[in-house]
Every structure is written in C-alpha cells, then in structure tokens.
C-alpha cells in the first residue's frame, strides 16, 4: 500500500472511545478539504479523477482514496474503476452524526469539514443523503461484509493493521462491505 500521502499534519487523534485513538490517517478528498474534490464527480472521466487522486502521493502501489462524497457517485466510480474494490462504511444516520460530534465535530483538525459541511443542520442533511446512496449500493452490488479491519485487510489482499489498531465493526456500530 502506498502510504506516501501520510504526514503528521494529516492525522487526527481523539479520545471519543475512552482512550486516545487514531481517527484519521492520510489524505482525505472532499469539497473544501485539503484535497478538494468537485461535488459532481459524474462529470469527470477516469484520467481526470486519477489526476485529482494522485496529488498527495509520491510513491507507488495500491492507493487508498478516502472520500465521503464518493457515496453519491458509487455507480460512476465503479464503472470507471471496475477493477478496484470500493469499501462502503455504513452507520445509522443519527449515530453517524452523534459519533462525528463526539469525535470533535468542527474542531476536528484533519480533515477540515467546515467549508463543505458548514453547520450541524447541513452535516445532518448530507449524512442522510450519503447514507441513502450507500444503502442503495449495499443492496445492489455483490460483495463481502467484513466483521473487523483484520478481515477487511484480508478481503483487500493488503497487510493487516497492527493489533493496537484492531477495530471490531459491530462494537463500533458500523457495517463495512467491499464491493
């Protein structure tokens, strides 16, 4: 896995779980974030998207591209990058908003959610919209449901994370599917 998008500035730790945990690691791509993405990705072809995704990377290998707005463009991304697995992460709308608030809401230092998500009302509306599209893709596409990040790494064929970063998705009120 190409981890060249890593920098200390692209990490976020918080104690929402009761202990200091790494919450974000590496580049994030969304409107208004450090690696800004246009809201309507459906107007972009594969080469244009690759150019956007390449910006934080200097290495080679498998790249993990993280974005919330991918939720609204799953069919388009699957069509353009059919050979690439896509990870769907789903948490109930209210639980999703509650977890985000608990983890620091607009005080999260990386990535910066403020420009695109603006306020809690807008954030709640966008979460509902994104989760609706994730649920639709979850039902439409065949795939593999992962119980934890160790199993997810196996499905993806990448190195398993160290034990100190083990995450049981059910205990985190999260569902994860690779399509």
Where in the sequence are the language-model features?
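PAPS-dependent sulfotransferase catalytic core
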Residues: 1-52, 154, 162-178
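PAPS-dependent sulfotransferase catalytic domain
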Residues: 59-161
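Walker A/P-loop-proximal flanking segment of P-loop NTPase domains
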Residues: 55
């Amino acid at each position: 896995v190409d981890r060249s998008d890593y920098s200390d500035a692209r990490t976020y730790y918080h104690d929402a779980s009761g202990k200091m945990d790494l919450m974000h690691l590496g580049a994030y791509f969304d409107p208004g974030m450090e690696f800004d993405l246009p809201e309507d990705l459906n107007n972009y072809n594969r080469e244009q998207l690759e150019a956007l995704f390449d910006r934080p990377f200097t290495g080679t290998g498998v790249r993990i591209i993280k974005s919330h707005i991918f939720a609204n463009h799953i069919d388009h991304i699957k069509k353009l990058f059919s050979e690439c697995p896509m990870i769907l992460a789903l948490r109930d709308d209210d639980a999703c908003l509650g977890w985000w608030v608990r983890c620091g809401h607009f005080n999260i230092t990386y990535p910066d959610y403020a420009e695109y998500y603006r306020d809690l009302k807008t954030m709640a509306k966008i979460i509902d919209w994104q989760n609706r599209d994730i649920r639709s893709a979850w039902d439409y596409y065949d795939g593999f449901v992962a119980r934890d990040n160790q199993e997810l790494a196996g499905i993806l064929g990448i190195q398993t994370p160290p034990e100190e970063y083990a995450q049981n998705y059910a205990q985190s009120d999260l569902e994860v599917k690779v399509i």
